[in-house]
């Protein structure tokens, strides 16, 4: 059920004590782990003094030293997506080598939350920001049970529920708009993370997300489109993982869809698609996972910048994530390489019951 909480310790253990075993058992490598650490170092070095990250890389000590800045204005979206890789590797505001970095980022998000009658508005004008930032708060709360995070996380979840399209069940840039699958996916991720952390999530909100997925599916639920059933590989990967978040029972359709997406191998430029597809294939223990993962893992490691001020970062020729620039691409690449142990909370076995 949407409101059922898993034992946080069992859900997040892979990020800390179980990390090495998870890397060995699920398809990571010493090279992917080293790549994660380089990526986290680059992210830490590009945090602004106020605790935020910016897609345009302003406010940090970069001084224009990195190419390919992003254009999205929401600082809560950029701060949220930069925090997620630290949390994914077990770093919180109370534990880990990057705890000061994480503490400043979480404090920035909490300070940016704007109280409204509908809940805590954290989006800075876009539901992308709301979903990503709420996911970071919910994950940090689940990992630490820090009461200081409970209030902001609860308020942000309440805003997400209120912002859902009451007719078709999705989310888009502004509250109440007919949904698209990319914005919807971030809200669903935040909702599932909060639910497994024990925070209240209305079951009707999760049900509504399932209704949205019904509207954008095609080919018997194996493919998914952006706002309608016209599918692309990227939107299909997102939709299939969202089906797993919402507890869809047609696992045969999910597995067929994943097989179709995995068959050509990972597109070396499609980091957004591969970020979602890696999670779905591993979560399903899909037969295509070992071969697909080996290629995806090694090509991401090989694509990481190794020299100069950009060392540790990534930039892909991916039109689906171009507005996020180097910051978003680096965060997504690190998150994808953390998939072997980043089981909390939405990716764990309890998350898709």
Each model region followed by its residue ranges:
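An alpha-helical repeat/solenoid feature that recognizes helix-turn-helix modules
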Residues: 2-41, 45, 55-101, 114-158, ...
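Acidic carboxylate motifs that coordinate Ca2+ or other divalent cations, activating on Asp/Glu
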Residues: 50
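Patatin-like phospholipase
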Residues: 106-109
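Short, solvent-exposed mixed-charge patches
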Residues: 351-353
């Amino acid at each position: 059920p949407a409101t059922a909480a898993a034992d946080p310790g069992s859900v997040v253990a892979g990020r800390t004590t179980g990390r090495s075993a998870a890397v060995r058992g699920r398809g990571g490598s010493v090279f992917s782990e080293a790549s994660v650490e380089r990526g986290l170092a680059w992210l830490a070095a590009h945090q602004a003094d106020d605790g935020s990250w910016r897609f345009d890389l302003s406010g940090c000590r970069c001084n224009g030293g990195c190419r390919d800045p992003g254009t999205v204005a929401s600082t809560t979206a950029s701060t949220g997506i930069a925090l997620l890789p630290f949390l994914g590797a077990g770093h919180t505001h109370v534990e880990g080598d990057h705890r000061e970095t994480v503490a400043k980022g979480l404090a920035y998000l909490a300070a940016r939350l704007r109280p409204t009658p509908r809940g805590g508005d954290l989006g800075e004008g876009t539901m992308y920001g709301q979903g990503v930032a709420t996911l970071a708060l919910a994950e940090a709360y689940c990992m630490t049970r820090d009461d200081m995070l409970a209030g902001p996380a609860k308020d942000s979840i309440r805003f997400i529920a209120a912002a859902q399209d009451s007719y078709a069940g999705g989310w888009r840039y502004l509250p109440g708009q007919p949904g698209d699958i990319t914005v919807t996916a971030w809200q669903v991720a935040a909702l599932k993370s909060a639910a497994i952390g024990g925070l209240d999530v209305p079951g009707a909100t999760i049900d509504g997300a399932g209704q949205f997925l019904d509207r954008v599916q095609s080919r018997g639920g194996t493919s998914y489109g952006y706002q309608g059933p016209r599918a692309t590989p990227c939107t299909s990967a997102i939709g299939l993982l969202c089906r797993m978040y919402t507890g869809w029972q047609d696992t045969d359709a999910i597995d067929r869809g994943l097989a179709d997406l995995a068959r050509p191998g990972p597109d070396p430029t499609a980091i957004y698609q591969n970020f979602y597809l890696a999670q779905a294939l591993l979560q399903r223990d899909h037969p295509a996972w070992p071969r697909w993962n080996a290629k995806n893992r090694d090509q991401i490691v090989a694509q990481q910048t190794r020299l100069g001020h950009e060392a540790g970062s990534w930039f892909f020729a991916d039109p689906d994530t171009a507005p996020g620039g180097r910051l978003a691409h680096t965060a997504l690449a690190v998150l994808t390489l953390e998939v072997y142990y980043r089981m909390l909370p939405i990716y764990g076995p309890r998350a898709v019951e």
